[in-house]
């Protein structure tokens, strides 16, 4: 099923999509471990229509706590909740790729689709995933009711920029089809459609032929989109004017050539610390060496060791934080919250605020201290 279940083009009228039932994390981990034991396979594809960020966070923590080593991928929505730190946590648990619907890369059409996302948001989430080493496949759509050729060309230009920036590695253009169980199919007149048939013939035969009062997508658009995508995936033609992919005349894209750069500049600070987040440490055990009033904190990393020198009380506080945030199966209680971290800091609130802006803190964050 799908926890969002609002997209107007999707068959959300069907029970198997609209009735989302989340599997408890403990039960899911048990199923994974059982399948590993039965098949000796450690690659998993989670087939939810869209997996909620909170559920994936819980799954990732459980996999790491129990040291269940798998490679996995699944379907998501480009939700703001997929922060850079959450994406790093997912990658640490074995996530190698995600698929998600961008559909039409047009904010006007995304509103009409009730996707609940924006094109800028999509770029930022894709960037967080890619920085964590997770591959991104985007579902794309053209020919949505009321979509203009200009909007289609603008969408293709945004997709081109996403590929240029390596924010998306794979994608596919689907032509819009009204279906019998979608909000559009259930109320076609409200969307400017006239259904031509056929009569409903069951679950597997639910595509509806239709006409839109403003006309249909011109012939040749689909072929140009298909042609462009085949080349983009191979890294070809990314510097070309997107109009060159079409055999028919198309308008000049109105999208700024620096759209992705500007969208990413508006990113919030890397998982900006807020009171309801918790600190999780995905690195190895820290070691502190005291040197008079100062101390050197060492933390092992995947490739190289990270070391920071701090006043001894701060080094001990940070070492305690990393120990408390370590992922381990015998853990009792929750991981330290941001409020608890701030209260335990050996200094004033102003000193704490200053400390988390220092390079030493950023180095520890980069080494594996996550706020999720």
Where are these regions (language model features)?
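Short Fe-S-cluster ligation motifs
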Residues: 30-49
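Radical SAM enzyme core and accessory elements
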Residues: 209-372
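Canonical Radical SAM [4Fe-4S] cluster-binding loop centered on the CxxxCxxC motif
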Residues: 1-24
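Structured mid-domain segments that build the active-site/substrate or prosthetic-cofactor binding neighborhood
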Residues: 12, 21, 25-29, 34, ...
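Conserved, mostly hydrophobic/aromatic
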Residues: 2, 28, 46, 100
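A structural motif corresponding to the C-terminal lobe/cap of the Radical SAM core domain
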Residues: 64-71, 75-255
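Active-site-adjacent beta->alpha loops and helix N-cap segments on the catalytic face
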Residues: 52-58
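Hydrophobic residues within beta-strands of alpha/beta enzymes
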Residues: 10, 42-46, 98, 171
